[in-house]
């Protein structure tokens, strides 16, 4: 088993209070350029633009898919040895078992109002199958896409040194959609230990809090043992981890039991 001081440093500050995330709601009405917005939302701006750009090449994503791939990116950030609190914004689990960030949600709305994103309704879309079909019924047909201005802004943000450390996590998370479908990745993440535990509780629950993170530590430790601990492209552990979670989805068991 991994000690609490292991290389996956999720700490008690990881998941900020809901009040802290709610403070970001004021951001939704700000129409100033992205770089002039609050410092704590800059990562969310870059993440949203980058993930939409990556995923729209495969299948134009909806908002809840952006939240899920951003959460997967944060997990890879942790896998790479960084504390989740340094990701820049926190996540909560919302029923039935999806990761959600108030910061990211308000960022998407602001980018839409600024003309950096467009929102369309896909009449041909069918509800996502599996454990998230409740949300899929109302959201699966809503698609997000970068505008020309959005692509230009993403390119500019990518050139900034302060954003470059995020790029490899976003790209690795996005690469899983080339192996599995976007809905399959979303459904698989439901079996991530934090989300699995949240599905057994009532109401929203903060994610990546130290006291509940031992199963995630153990999964990542086992993954590093299997793949080797030398530096390697993060798309490999990302794809293997999603594949493991997909296997979990095919059976009815608690993924945290696999590490005991």
What residues fall within each predicted segment?
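Domain-edge interaction signal
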Residues: 2-260
């Amino acid at each position: 088993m991994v000690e609490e001081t292991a290389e996956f440093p999720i700490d008690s500050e990881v998941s900020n209070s809901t009040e802290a995330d709610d403070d970001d709601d004021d951001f939704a009405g700000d129409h100033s350029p992205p770089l002039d917005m609050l410092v704590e939302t800059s990562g969310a701006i870059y993440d949203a633009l980058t993930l939409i750009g990556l995923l729209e090449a495969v299948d134009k994503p909806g908002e809840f898919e952006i939240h899920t791939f951003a959460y997967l990116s944060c997990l890879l950030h942790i896998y790479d040895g960084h504390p989740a609190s340094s990701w820049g914004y926190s996540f909560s689990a919302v029923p039935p078992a999806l990761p959600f960030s108030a910061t990211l949600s308000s960022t998407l709305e602001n980018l839409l109002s600024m003309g950096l994103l467009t929102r369309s309704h896909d009449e041909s879309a069918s509800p996502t199958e599996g454990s998230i079909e409740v949300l899929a019924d109302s959201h699966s047909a809503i698609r997000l896409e970068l505008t020309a201005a959005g692509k230009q802004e993403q390119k500019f943000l990518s050139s900034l040194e302060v954003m470059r450390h995020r790029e490899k996590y976003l790209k690795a998370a996005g690469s899983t959609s080339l192996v599995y479908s976007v809905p399959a990745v979303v459904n698989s993440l439901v079996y991530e230990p934090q989300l699995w535990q949240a599905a057994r509780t009532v109401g929203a629950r903060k994610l990546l809090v130290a006291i509940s993170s031992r199963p995630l530590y153990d999964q990542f430790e086992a993954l590093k043992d299997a793949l080797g601990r030398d530096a390697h492209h993060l798309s490999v552990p990302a794809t293997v981890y999603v594949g493991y979670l997909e296997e979990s989805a095919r059976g009815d068991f608690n993924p945290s039991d696999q590490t005991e």
